[in-house]
Regions:
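Amphipathic alpha-helical segments used for helix-helix packing
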Residues: 97-118
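Short hydrophobic/aromatic patch on the recognition helix
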Residues: 40-50
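Amphipathic alpha-helical packing segments from all-alpha helical-bundle domains
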Residues: 66-69, 73, 117-143, 152-156, ...
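Amphipathic alpha-helical segments enriched in hydrophobic/aromatic and basic residues
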Residues: 22-25, 31-32, 43, 53, ...
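C-terminal peripheral helix-coil segments that are non-catalytic and often amphipathic
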Residues: 1, 95, 99, 132-140, ...
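Hydrophobic alpha-helical connector segments
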Residues: 59, 73-99, 151-158
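Basic, helix-initiating cap at the start of DNA-binding domains
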Residues: 1-38, 55
């Protein structure tokens, strides 16, 4: 097996173990010592793949960004009805959290406490991008004959709803799914 492929696989393995550790409802802080122990490698071996723990979290954030915005772009490209776009985007965000509970702790900033502040800034940017997409969809919805509301306020409400559901999921020890009551609450958001 080529060394580059092996190196890439080890990087992915490290990120997967971090994501698994983040799923622990106790929410213990992830240290490189604990991570190395779980992987049965030395801390030095971790640093051969990532220059810092912050870089490991950046790898998780990149995965989240690629996953979320890959699907959002597909939804916007494939669906003409703006309200259906919004519903699909919000459903995807809630579903992504259910399928990736460890990532929720990154998305709400829980796992980033006491880490490099640029990580939280990057998550804030991700939230801002999602909100901007929702705002644009709401503007398009107004041109399609749907009730015209303040797109900025409505987009902020929608994102706040999603982040609140993520927060509730994490704080419940991943017992209360983000999509719980979603279809009943959707009409209240639009």
């Amino acid at each position: 097996m080529p060394a580059e492929k092996k190196r890439g696989e080890r990087k992915m393995q490290i990120l997967q173990v971090i994501a698994e550790m983040l799923q622990d409802p106790k929410g213990e802080r992830i240290t490189t010592a604990l991570l190395a122990k779980k992987l049965d490698v030395s801390e030095a071996a971790l640093y051969r793949h990532f220059a810092s723990k912050a870089q490991m979290f950046e790898g998780l954030i990149e995965f989240i960004e690629q996953s979320v915005f890959g699907v959002i772009n597909k939804i916007v490209a494939d669906e003409d009805n703006a309200l259906k776009q919004i519903h699909a985007i919000l459903s995807m965000l809630l579903g992504f959290a259910e399928r990736n509970p460890g990532m929720v702790r990154v998305l709400i900033g829980d796992a980033l406490v006491n880490e490099n502040e640029r990580l939280q800034l990057r998550i804030n940017q991700l939230h801002d991008r999602v909100e901007a997409t929702l705002k644009q969809c709401l503007r398009v919805a107004a041109t399609q004959g749907h009730e015209e509301t303040d797109p900025a306020a409505r987009a902020n409400l929608m994102l706040s709803y999603v982040v609140g559901r993520w927060q509730q999921f994490a704080k419940s020890g991943f017992k209360r799914p983000p999509s719980e009551l979603w279809e009943k609450q959707w009409p209240m958001l639009v």
